[in-house]
């Protein structure tokens, strides 16, 4: 075990740490700022979350990589929002557990093509997140 850990440590010293920096090095501000900006990024999405009506079959892979908007805006009142979208055709394998059959199939997934920082709240809505009422009316469940 000690030999393995030593080999890993030597490898990291030669190649650098997985994050792209050598241990002890500080990532430059501009690099951090640019990488955190609102932009399209490859994101893994579950096929069943994107196509909830398809629960009777099994998909391989169970998730796919698509471009989605993500990142930080310079103002907390703004959020990273898609301003351009298109449909991507992605080939997957669909397996039917009842018939033990499988087939290759093309499914459609929404991809973001452009992003912008936009206000979190629309005009006419009260600004800010809705706060839960303290001591207010609580939802009643049938078994309470």
Curated annotation (Swiss-Prot):
- Show which residues constitute the signal peptide: 1-24
* Assembly information from the UniProt record: Homodimer; disulfide-linked. Interacts with VEGF receptor-2 (KDR) with high affinity, but not with VEGF receptor-1 (Flt-1), VEGF receptor-3 (FLT4), and neuropilin-1 (NRP1).
What is the top-level taxon of the source organism?
Eukaryota
Q: Name one Pfam family in it.
A: PDGF
Tissue-level expression reads:
Expressed by the venom gland.
A GO CC term attached to the entry: membrane
Q: What role is this protein assigned?
A: Snake venom VEGFs may contribute to venom dispersion and prey subjugation by inducing vascular permeability and hypotension. This protein induces angiogenesis probably through VEGF receptor (KDR/VEGFR-2) signaling, as well as drastic hypotension. The hypotension is mediated by nitric oxide, which is produced by VEGF-activated endothelium NO synthase. May also induce vascular permeability.
Origin organism is Daboia russelii (Russel's viper)
Q: Which GO terms describe its biological process?
A: induction of positive chemotaxis; positive regulation of angiogenesis; positive regulation of endothelial cell proliferation; positive regulation of mast cell chemotaxis; response to hypoxia; sprouting angiogenesis; vascular endothelial growth factor receptor signaling pathway; vascular endothelial growth factor signaling pathway
In terms of SMART domains, this protein maps to:
PDGF
Record keywords = Disulfide bond, Growth factor, Pyrrolidone carboxylic acid, Secreted, Signal, Toxin
Fetch the InterPro entries from UniProt: Cystine-knot_cytokine, PD_growth_factor_CS, PDGF/VEGF_dom, PDGF/VEGF_growth_factor
Q: List the disulfide bonds.
A: 38-80, 69-115, 73-117
Q: Where is the composition biased (Basic and acidic residues)?
A: 120-134
Q: Which SUPFAM superfamilies does the record cross-reference, listed alphabetically?
A: Cystine-knot cytokines
The residues of the propeptide are 134-144
Which family is this protein grouped under? Belongs to the PDGF/VEGF growth factor family. Snake venom VEGF subfamily.
Q: Where is this region: Disordered?
A: 120-144
- Name-wise, this protein is Snake venom vascular endothelial growth factor toxin VR-1
